[in-house]
Amino acid sequence: QVLELPGEEPAQVLLKGLPDLLQRVDQVQQRLGTVSALAAPGEQPASAVPGLQPAAALRPYPGVKPLGARERTGLLAAVRKTLPPAKTEDADDYVMPPRIEVYPLTAQQALVFEFSDCGAYICLFDISSRSRTAPYALQPLQMQALPAGSVDHAGGLNYYPETGELSSFLMGRGIGDCGEMASWHFDGQAFQLTDYRRMPTCSGLGYEDWPVLWSAEAPKRP
């Protein structure tokens, strides 16, 4: 691929820091002194590089009883009590009221999504957990953080109580060829990250072809 720049002046790319960068890569991957080293290949065989360690096994999703009508009504009412008073549509500072979704998480806890400031395909959102019984108080929620540089609390969310899978997506534009996507697996105690991919450039590629920055296999329910 040839990079073309405007104008007639030849482009200059400084590679002064490249050797140090490659040496750091070799150090992290433990390739120093081997024939596969990037900065300064040595005489040790490529087999001297330690193999990839298998990812830690995740606990299977234990399943959960669906929310009853009384639980759902109580949860929605408890969340709405925490929201500011709604504005009338003719008010100058009117914003659409948040959309609230509730899901069963464990026998004692529910998962709550609050969506606000929604555009065509992007919302701001908040994730929390509440007790499934009155007064439906907030409960601790353990969730593995996304890698550095990701965008939190913006985009869209989906949760599937049948499988314990939580997914988020942030599209850079409507056709969905750039942005971020992530998936978590609920193991009965915490949400463990199983997939995170990011495509900063809108290039016509579907999310299945985006660079994967994190991957872990979620076990199936027995």
Model-found features: residue ranges?
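Beta-propeller blade termini
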Residues: P97-P104, G156-N158
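Structural motif
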Residues: A120-S128, G176-A182
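Acidic/hydrophobic-patterned starts of short beta strands in beta-sheet-rich repeat architectures
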Residues: P104-S116, Y160-L170
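Internal interaction segment
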Residues: V2-G74, D195-P211
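A short, solvent-exposed beta-edge/loop patch
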Residues: Q1-P10, G174, S183-F186
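Short aromatic loop motif centered on NTY/YTY
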Residues: L138-P222
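Short, non-transmembrane alpha-helical segments in secretory-pathway proteins
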Residues: Y61-D93
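Surface-exposed loop/turn elements that mediate protein-protein interactions on large endomembrane-trafficking
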Residues: K81-E89, I127-A145, H185-A190
